[in-house]
Amino acid sequence: MLSPNDKMLGKLDPFYQPSVSKQKTSAEIISEARNALRTVRTQRPFTPQEAQRKLFGPASSRTSENRPPSSFSLHASSFESSDSRPISGTRLSPLELKPKVPASPTREEDSCFSFPKPPVDPAKIRRVSNARARLFRAASQRALLPDRSLPPSDSKKTVESKETVMMGDSMVKINGIYLTKSNAICHLKSHPLQLTDDGGFSEIKEQEMFKGTTSLPSHLKNGGDQGKRHARASSCPSSSDLSRLQTKAVPKADLQEEDAEIEVDEVFWNTRIVPILRELEKEENIETVCAACTQLHHALEEGNMLGNKFKGRSILLKTLCKLVDVGSDSLSLKLAKIILALKVSRKNLLNVCKLIFKISRNEKNDSLIQNDSILESLLEVLRSEDLQTNMEAFLYCMGSIKFISGNLGFLNEMISKGAVEILINLIKQINENIKKCGTFLPNSGHLLVQVTATLRNLVDSSLVRSKFLNISALPQLCTAMEQYKGDKDVCTNIARIFSKLTSYRDCCTALASYSRCYALFLNLINKYQKKQDLVVRVVFILGNLTAKNNQAREQFSKEKGSIQTLLSLFQTFHQLDLHSQKPVGQRGEQHRAQRPPSEAEDVLIKLTRVLANIAIHPGVGPVLAANPGIVGLLLTTLEYKSLDDCEELVINATATINNLSYYQVKNSIIQDKKLYIAELLLKLLVSNNMDGILEAVRVFGNLSQDHDVCDFIVQNNVHRFMMALLDAQHQDICFSACGVLLNLTVDKDKRVILKEGGGIKKLVDCLRDLGPTDWQLACLVCKTLWNFSENITNASSCFGNEDTNTLLLLLSSFLDEELALDGSFDPDLKNYHKLHWETEFKPVAQQLLNRIQRHHTFLEPLPIPSF
């Protein structure tokens, strides 16, 4: 007796059917428990928080010799005061200059030739004005300095431009001054020392100065005497600029602007920066030095002196790095922030990242890191520096970010500063490099461990999950997992990310649509079959994908070797679980239900869930039902496991058997072993676990369509148990129990059992108490009573006088639409109830009411007269 809804699905075998798939609503959530084929839920694998902050935790597959250290010593001597780029080892050939500019003036004073003046860029004028304004601000806060040259002691600290020395028909450029050879030698004798690019002083030797010179074209011969000009850096083109003179003349406005900015920087340096550096050199109490560092950072920022173009950078670095040895975490963070702002590179970048990493290992320093906005500086390193050149620096930078990402106090800052986008971009760079070059970057696997661990901490946020979908992060993670499938740590972290993401419908749908993920997950299961921490998460992900998407069930099952992979995994962990089982006499009886599942049990729980979910697909379910290996392991699980041993595993295995028993196919192992399965279910029926009882009754609902199983039910008094369950006042249990009784009443010989156990009254009570809120259950009750009353001659003799009158009253009122649907439901639930009332309950109830009315007399019997 199927409802119109059931008939539309075109499947007449089971006694109840799943509802038509549609967008999930609150009404559909209620009806899910009624489906003959049901998905199975489970908990996400637990990931304990690491006790210590390290690059690689205790569960890492890396050996101590095969990974970068988390502990190291770091001192001022670790840093380099010179942070210039390495000099190329290739000697370039001199360029033959053929300038197209007019011949040079004959006067030596005009060797810095004058070119036609193009219109001055207004933006450049503004920059010069700003530089001048900065000078006036600095001067107003300190004693006003002379407008021209600095005192001799200070001028020695001024960084000059590169030296250009030419021999014969050449010229010499020293500290921005072009000199002839003879004048240059005199200049060197009177100025033997100069400040080098790295901030140190060096002595210029004549032979070094004139080494490797080249001759100049005629227009540069007889160069003018620059002694009349002030020594200002870059006031004339350097040797590296000469090659550009063929096509481009240097505008005089640019030279004037550069002169002004350099002059302003010198004044600002001496009036604002030098006094702070002197304060730092005193190394008084930590609070004073920290305050001075903060003041220094603000001053450098105000003077626009941050970055790798700043000329006093080496002197500044030397002063700052010296303070690292003080050993104060708060001071070191302030030093690190300034050093990073100076755009250091190579060894210094690595060491400053190590310094922050070392501090961030202590959770107590999280507040210091947050107060100093160190996160922003670290993200800037990842955003702006070159990945290949600075892989090790990136590693420790990411290690620090990973540590603080575990602190919820940083979550909003990380999201707002673009951490998610930056980290996914890093993964993308690594993926693209492998695709382009076919090789792995050194230490890229170590870096990916830190990146993926950080993302794992962040994906609990709905904002982060939304960003993942917007920037297509899931395919990038799958690609990284595929390329680094030999790195268990990377794969485990990405599996943890997917475990969290697929617990949400939108993310689960996005991953399910990436068709390559199924083969990837199967490969990981085959590769790491005995690595429980990875396998359990991969299987959990597959369970999520197949629970919410029928297309995912189909795609997974079509992957080569998918069922065999699941079977092999089932066998592996079944054996591990058997070996870990204690003898019955040694098992503790107290608090057994509270014992968490073992590692092997946890994998089996997730695995049976996948089997139950994919069995819903009509193309997969019959295949699984006919697989002796799958069915055999499920039955073995019920044989040696009790609800007290592992409740979730037993219930999942039973739910899987229920879904497989739905398919009435010739080669079904379930059908061949139906009586043995019925025996195994008896121990669940007599348990005190309501979930276990419910799953067992559901299986009996499918199996009881077979005549032999019905005989087994009656012989073992299972029908009495089903009638007793009608008193449970639990809608799902009553629904399933009523389904078994309905199947029993198909056999005319077994209809009488309803009267023997008071079944009719229990069915009527169930209709009265639960019918108005569950029209599907009310429909099943009416179907059962319809089957029972097939050969009715008199309603009262069939149902009993009291139950007949109750049925007439209930059916009449339940068939009144206004009375039946006058419930306080939200619109969604109201439509749901109306649908099932109209399509399922009303047709059957109307026929039953008509039958009772036809065979019932309303004449009351006359009382027996008394004599």
UniProtKB/Swiss-Prot annotation:
Record key words, sorted: Differentiation, Disease variant, Repeat, Spermatogenesis
Residue spans of biased composition, Low complexity class: 70-81, 234-243
InterPro entries: ARM-like, ARM-type_fold, Armadillo, ARMC2
Tissues in which the protein is found: Expressed at higher level in testis.
Protein's GO biological process: cell morphogenesis; cilium organization; nucleus organization; sperm axoneme assembly
Bias (Polar residues): 18-28, 40-50, 60-69
Placement of ARM repeats on the sequence: 262-301, 304-344, 363-403, 408-449, 462-503, 506-547, 551-589, 591-616, 619-662, 664-705, 707-746, 748-790
Residue ranges, annotated region (Disordered): 1-115, 214-252
Illness: Spermatogenic failure 38: An autosomal recessive infertility disorder characterized by asthenoteratozoospermia. Spermatozoa exhibit multiple morphologic abnormalities including short, absent, coiled, bent, or irregular-caliber flagella.
Role: Required for sperm flagellum axoneme organization and function. Involved in axonemal central pair complex assembly and/or stability.
Protein name, as recorded: Armadillo repeat-containing protein 2
Species the sequence originates in: Homo sapiens (Human)
Gene: ARMC2
